[in-house]
Amino acid sequence: MVNLGFVIAEFNRDLTYMMEKLAEEHAQFLGANVVCKVMVPGSFDMPLAIKTLLKKDNIDAVVTIGCVIEGDTEHDEIVVQNAARKIADLSLEFEKPVALGISGPGMTRMQAEDRIDYGKSAVEAAVKMVKRINDIKNSN
């Protein structure tokens, strides 16, 4: 069984709540176990929580769940680009998958509502990567 940690943004919580519930249902469907959930203020705040989870022996992968809606400035792009880069760096540093379930940037609220399945897709990616990395490690 694959053990997952979730890092969930509180910003736009009505949307991240729906994303979280779909992600949990999909984890259960795939036979994965969500062993820990950490709430953070926003997507930009995720890296430290991700790093803390990746240090835990009982976490095989981390799933991020966030929603960054376009505003009047380019703030949404800066948030998502920096979060995505750091998330990828942490995955490589700890040699564990960290799946990007953050919707945005450049989307309206209506588009965000249409993309609540990003959390589900992130769970799918995390579980697949854990299994595939384990296959590589166990092959001759």
From Swiss-Prot:
Instruction: Give the positions the UniProt entry annotates as the active site.
Output: 75
- EC number(s) stated in the UniProt entry for this protein: 2.5.1.78
Which pathway is recorded for this entry?
A: Cofactor biosynthesis; riboflavin biosynthesis; riboflavin from 2-hydroxy-3-oxobutyl phosphate and 5-amino-6-(D-ribitylamino)uracil: step 1/2
The cysteines covalently paired via disulfide bonds are: none
Transferase found in the keyword field: yes
Provide the transmembrane region boundaries.
none
Q: Does the keyword Transferase apply?
A: yes
Q: Name one GO biological process term.
A: riboflavin biosynthetic process
Matching entries from Pfam families are given as: DMRL_synthase
Matching InterPro entries: LS, LS/RS, LS/RS_sf
| Protein family per UniProt | Belongs to the DMRL synthase family.
The name this protein goes by in its record: 6,7-dimethyl-8-ribityllumazine synthase
